[in-house]
Amino acid sequence: MMDLSNLLPSVIDIARASGQVILDIYQHGQFEKQVKNDNTPVTSADLAAHKLVVERLTELTPDIPVLSEEDAGIPLSERRQWQRYWLVDPLDGTQEFIAGSGDFATIIALVADNQPVMGVVYAPISGVAYYAYHGKGAWKITPEGETVRISTHKHELPTQSIAVAISRRQDIQAITNRLDPSLNYDLVPLGSAALKSCLVAEGAVDCYLRLGPTGEWDTAATQCIVEEAGGRILNTHLTPLSYNERDTLENPNFITLGDESLPWSTILTPDNRMMEV
């Protein structure tokens, strides 16, 4: 059995090193940008961070494969042979990086038997790191170096107001159409799928409803962090996400939720909860 506690400090260091590479390019203000086959952008910062993370993880654990967003063309026939693997988004929030909002992060997950067992998220602009590994809780390292245990926000029922993290680029009407109109909602815009899920994990918001394309690398690390903090990441049928089981690496629409005692099956209006966009 792999000792995750021994691996964790090195993985955090790798995420921070990746973040520094990204930050150097971001602050310099000059970078190359291309459009990938899926019509999403990739920058020289994505590629530099990818190179660093893959090289460092391979040095750390030569026997564990690395699957990165920037090198994701490995077929399922090969991937299904992996009992465990690293799943990485070197720069989550590329559009926010390009726009200059600062909402981006490096994400590293260790997946074993189709479920994430370790997750690290590092936000270069704030200097905050989030991490968790199976059975040991979820934690946040502040810019000052203080390590604080985090947990999701628990409501006193009945609740009348729910804080919802949304993408800065999300169609707000598409979100509100899927929420019970009898409740009040505080919509909190933020870039980076990982950082929004981390807001749920630390109790800053109650949920993050994601409609639209994401990859498995966008959710694996935060699924571990959120679950260890007391929450869940579920698809819109309210069943858990899983990893490395399909030809596609694209996620379904999903919700990151903090307090499972809330009636999510009615908060997410039944007619719309089942819809995929």
Predicted features by range, described:
Residues 1-13, 19, 178-182, 196-277:
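Oxyanion/phosphate-interacting regions
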Residues 7, 55, 59, 73-145, ...:
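Active-site-adjacent structural elements in enzyme catalytic cores
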Residues 109-198, 245-277:
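Acidic beta-strand-loop-alpha-helix segment within the catalytic core
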